């Protein structure tokens, strides 16, 4: 059976993120990483809420998710979703064929905050000798410098960025999927 790895930021900016979370939660071959948007949700609605986090979350597109969780979901359903988010890892190490990958939302690091918030630079040296890091969080146009073409998966030195701006407002945005078996790219 094939597996789908989702490297975070499923919620926010557009309606329907909560429904997507439910599908991921209930699908055995879907694996999700914690992204900064899920962390902002946890910081606002989770059991260890952080003062000021609601404003940061809403300023970063969280209003749809906030309203869905507070006013559409039942308290039981909301608690299940918050629990699901609280159990998400912030990175995966996977092996596909003879390739090893380190999947992380934002940037490979020993620091958990960096793994969901920090942005790599296109000229960063490889993070690993034995595996390829696959990240999101930073739209690929900032890695490639190409602001005129539809966003495309960016391949660097031991680093692949797959964030093609799906959550952004630009018409150049796309949802990208990278098949790890052969690194073939798919776009919606």
Where are these regions (language model features)?
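Catalytic phosphate/metal-binding cores of nucleic-acid and nucleotide-processing enzymes, i.e., regions
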Residues: 4, 44, 49-50, 56-57, ...
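Short, well-ordered beta-strand micro-motif
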Residues: 93, 103-105, 177-179
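Short catalytic/ligand-binding loop motif for oxyanion handling, primarily in non-cytosolic enzymes
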Residues: 40-43, 94, 110-112, 142-143, ...
């Amino acid at each position: 059976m094939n597996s789908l790895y989702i490297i975070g930021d499923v919620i926010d900016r557009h309606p329907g993120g909560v429904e997507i979370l439910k599908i991921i939660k209930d699908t055995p071959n879907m694996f999700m990483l914690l992204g900064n948007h899920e962390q902002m949700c946890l910081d606002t609605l989770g059991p260890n809420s952080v003062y000021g986090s609601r404003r940061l979350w809403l300023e970063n597109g969280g209003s749809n998710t906030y309203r869905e969780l507070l006013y559409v979901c039942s308290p039981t359903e909301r608690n299940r979703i918050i629990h699901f988010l609280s159990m998400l890892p912030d990175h995966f190490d996977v092996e596909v064929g003879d390739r090893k990958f380190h999947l992380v939302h934002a940037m490979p690091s020993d620091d958990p905050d960096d793994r969901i918030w920090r942005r790599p630079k296109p000229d960063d040296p490889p993070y690993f000798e034995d595996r390829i890091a696959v990240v999101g969080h930073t739209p690929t146009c900032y890695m490639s410098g190409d602001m005129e073409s539809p966003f495309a998966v960016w391949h660097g030195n031991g680093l692949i960025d797959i964030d093609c701006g799906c959550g952004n407002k630009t018409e150049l945005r796309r949802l990208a999927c990278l098949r790890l078996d052969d690194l073939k790219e798919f776009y919606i």
